[in-house]
């Protein structure tokens, strides 16, 4: 049985992961980690297991085998220090990370297994692959990405939307910095630019659509999430996989073995 520690355990996604663990036969909640200022601090985190909400400095290494981080970007540095100190694999699902914070992830991956996924949906992992293949096959297509989330989401474009843009650029062997148009204030696209449209409304959990358009036709590849359990299940699946890996920097695609699947299909 794998013991899982959850950062941001009192938040919406933290609670979804705790519920997923309660329904799982291979893993269980080892630690529910929150800030000491949280209203949940000290309370019971589960109904059936004697696990209470604790702060990060109260975590004991024997409590957990792997960590899942659904906390805020400002907590990342301390969370990574804890993973490094106790040599624990960590799945980082926090969105809105800066480039400096992403570099810190890569640094931590030199000593512990780190998996970074701004979106832990298996469907999104597949979508990124499809976008990369499609952009490579249609090198002259205009690419636009639309994303929609709930009204309280703070970052935009979402980390997932940016990952899709990066997948498209990689498919064309382009520099992401050179083709990223961002959210265009004037509506004008650059020659090879990849642009973004953003919606924040009501309780939308997550929608992403990538459009590849050429004269006379277009391809639209999309993904919608209707339940946060999708993300929790994906994060837990990633944590189980990561617990068995050597130190390194991994993505959700690595857990799905998509490269081998694609190579096998191409040989048929």
Curated annotation (Swiss-Prot):
Record's keyword terms, sorted: Amino-acid biosynthesis, Cytoplasm, Diaminopimelate biosynthesis, Lysine biosynthesis, NAD, NADP, Oxidoreductase
Entry-linked InterPro entries: DapB_C, DapB_N, DapB_N_CS, DHDPR_bac, NAD(P)-bd_dom_sf
Entry keyword Transmembrane: no
Protein's pathway: Amino-acid biosynthesis; L-lysine biosynthesis via DAP pathway; (S)-tetrahydrodipicolinate from L-aspartate: step 4/4
Catalytic activity of the protein: (S)-2,3,4,5-tetrahydrodipicolinate + NAD(+) + H2O = (2S,4S)-4-hydroxy-2,3,4,5-tetrahydrodipicolinate + NADH + H(+); (S)-2,3,4,5-tetrahydrodipicolinate + NADP(+) + H2O = (2S,4S)-4-hydroxy-2,3,4,5-tetrahydrodipicolinate + NADPH + H(+)
Annotated compartments: Cytoplasm
Residues that, per the record, bind (S)-2,3,4,5-tetrahydrodipicolinate: 150, 159-160
Residues reported to bind NAD(+): 8-13, 93-95, 117-120
UniProt GO molecular function: 4-hydroxy-tetrahydrodipicolinate reductase; NAD binding; NADP binding; oxidoreductase activity, acting on CH or CH2 groups, NAD or NADP as acceptor
Protein residues bound to NADP(+): 35
Family membership noted in the UniProt record: Belongs to the DapB family.
Protein name, per record: 4-hydroxy-tetrahydrodipicolinate reductase
Organism: Idiomarina loihiensis (strain ATCC BAA-735 / DSM 15497 / L2-TR)
């Amino acid at each position: 049985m794998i013991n899982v520690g959850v950062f941001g355990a009192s938040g919406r996604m933290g609670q979804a992961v705790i519920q997923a663990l309660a329904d799982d036969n291979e893993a269980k909640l080892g630690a529910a980690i929150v800030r000491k200022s949280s209203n949940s601090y000290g309370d019971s985190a589960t109904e059936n297991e004697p696990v209470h909400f604790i702060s990060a400095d109260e975590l004991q290494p024997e409590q957990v085998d792997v960590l899942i981080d659904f906390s805020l970007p400002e907590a990342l540095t301390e969370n990574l220090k804890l993973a490094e100190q106790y040599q624990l694999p960590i799945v980082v699902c926090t969105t809105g990370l800066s480039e400096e914070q992403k570099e810190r992830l890569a640094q931590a991956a030199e000593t512990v297994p780190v998996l970074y996924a701004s979106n832990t949906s298996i469907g999104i992992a597949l979508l990124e692959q499809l976008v990369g293949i499609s952009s490579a096959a249609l090198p002259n297509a205009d690419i636009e990405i639309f994303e929609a989330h709930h009204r309280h989401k703070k970052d935009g474009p979402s980390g997932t939307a940016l990952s899709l843009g990066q997948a498209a650029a990689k498919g064309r062997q382009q520099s992401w910095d050179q083709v990223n148009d961002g959210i265009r204030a004037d509506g004008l696209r650059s020659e090879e630019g990849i642009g973004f449209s953003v919606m924040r409304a009501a309780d939308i959990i997550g929608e992403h659509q990538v459009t590849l358009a050429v004269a006379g036709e277009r391809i639209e590849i999309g993904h919608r999430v209707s339940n946060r359990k999708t993300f929790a299940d994906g994060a837990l699946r990633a944590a189980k996989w990561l617990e068995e890996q050597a130190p390194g920097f991994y993505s959700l695609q690595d857990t799905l073995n998509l490269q081998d699947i694609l190579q096998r299909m191409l040989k048929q």
